[in-house]
Amino acid sequence: MENAQTEQSASKTNGLLYSIGEAADLLKVSIPLLRLYEREGLVLPMRKSSRHRLYSASDLNRIRCIREMINDHKVSIEGIKRLLALIPCWKIKGCPEEARNTCKAFTSQMAPCWLETDRSWDCKSAVCRVCPVYENYANCGSLKQTIIECTIESTPRPHDVSA
């Protein structure tokens, strides 16, 4: 399964994969920092059968976004997790209401859906790394736009009162 996941993800990135050392060099960060981001669930690198981490260009963009939030905007790792928890995975995946209401990813605002262990029907067997909820939000701009759109859609509108 891991090899299939790596091959599937590699084909989506045109085969451009970087070891943890190469990724750290490209990003000008330490290897322990990349491991911390993984432990905190902010990035889900691919794994070779040898368990070595592989980072795609999308992973590097995600890490750049994380670094920008931390360094430029002073957002903590917990704050980033809460921002990622705002991604409406149930909407993106089309979860039915009954599944959504029992899913921790819907009812909790503490962490992104890929960190929840009690997930809905569709996500129990899914590989989060290749899920559109995780894949589509590798940069800050798309995350910000989605949060704006969902906030606008869910903002109560005053009822039209006819005289």
Language model region names:
Residues 162-163:
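Intrinsic disorder/low-complexity detector
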Residues 42, 57-58, 68-70, 78, ...:
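Surface-exposed beta-strand edges and their flanking turn/coil or helix-capping segments
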Residues 57, 82, 115:
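Phosphate-coordinating loops and pocket residues in cytosolic domains that bind phosphorylated ligands
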Residues 57, 75, 92-95:
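Residue-level signature of transmembrane alpha-helix interfaces in integral membrane proteins
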Residues 69, 73-87:
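Short amphipathic recognition helices of helix-turn-helix/homeodomain-type DNA-binding modules
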Residues 86-159:
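Cysteine-cluster motifs in flexible loop/terminal segments that predominantly coordinate metals
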Residues 1-68, 72:
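Basic helix-turn-helix/winged-helix DNA-binding cores
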Residues 10-11, 82, 106:
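Generic structural signal for beta-strand residues in well-ordered domains
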